[in-house]
C-alpha cells in the first residue's frame, strides 16, 4: 500500500517575514559574551600567577638594594623591604640581617635619596636598637625628608640614647623637622628633653607647640597644659586652616588624653562636657577614659 506524504504549502517569498533578534541580544552575542570569556581567561591567569608567586625574603630585597640598577630597582626594593619587614621580624631576629641593613644604609649616601629614606623606615619597623647610631648619623643628611624618616624611625625604636640628637633638631630651620622632633620625643618619653620641649612651647609654628605640649605631658610635665586646653576648644579648632575634620578630631583626642594623664584640674569640667555632648563618639570615648584619672 503506498503511503501518501501530506503536502505542505510553502509561502511565496513575498509572504516570508524576517524574524528580527532584539538589539540587546545582538549586543550580548557580539560584545558581552566575548568579554565574559576574556575576563574568565584573565582571572584564571591571575589565579595561577598568584598561586605560583613567591614573595622575596628580606635578605633578597636587601641584596637587590645593594646590587640593583640605580634607575629602576634599588629604591623599589627598598620600598618593598620597608613594607614587609614588620611581618618578618621574628624570622630574622637572631640573624645578621640588622648589621647587613645598617651597612647598606651607610653606603647609600650617594645616589637616589629614596633608597636611604626607605631603608631608614625599615630600620624603624625592625625596632632593633643596634640601628640607632646609624639613624642618628642619618639626621645630618641634607635631605630633609630623610631627616624626618630617621626621626620617625628613632621614635619607633624609642631608645633614649637618641634623645640628645633629636633635641638638636627642635631648632631646625625646617618647621616640619621641628614638628617631627617634638612628635618623636612624645614617643620616647625621656625627661631629659623637658627643658628643650618647654622652649619649643614658644615656637612660631602651631604644630611644634602642640607636639611639644603633648611630649611634655607624656613625661608628667604640665608646662604645656594651656596649649592643650586650646586643643579641646571647638571654637579654636574650627578656625584652623589646612586641617581635615579627622585631623582636628585626633588633635582633640590627644589633648584630652594628655590632660587626663596630667590630671589637670582646670580641664576636668570641659572634658566632662565633651564626654556627654560631643558629636564625635571617639572624642566622647577618650573623654570618658580621661575622667577615670581624676
Where are these regions (language model features)?
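Short, mixed-charge aromatic SLiMs
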Residues: 104-107, 147, 282-283
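Short, low-complexity patches enriched in S/T/P/G
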Residues: 20-31
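Structural detector for internal amphipathic alpha-helices that build alpha-solenoid repeat scaffolds
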Residues: 44-53, 72-90, 113-128, 137, ...
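N-terminal intrinsically disordered, acidic low-complexity segments at the extreme N-terminus
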Residues: 1-20
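C-terminal/domain-terminus segments
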Residues: 273-289
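Short inter-helical turns and helix N-cap capping residues of alpha-solenoid HEAT/ARM repeat scaffolds
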Residues: 69-70, 109-112, 142-143, 173-174, ...
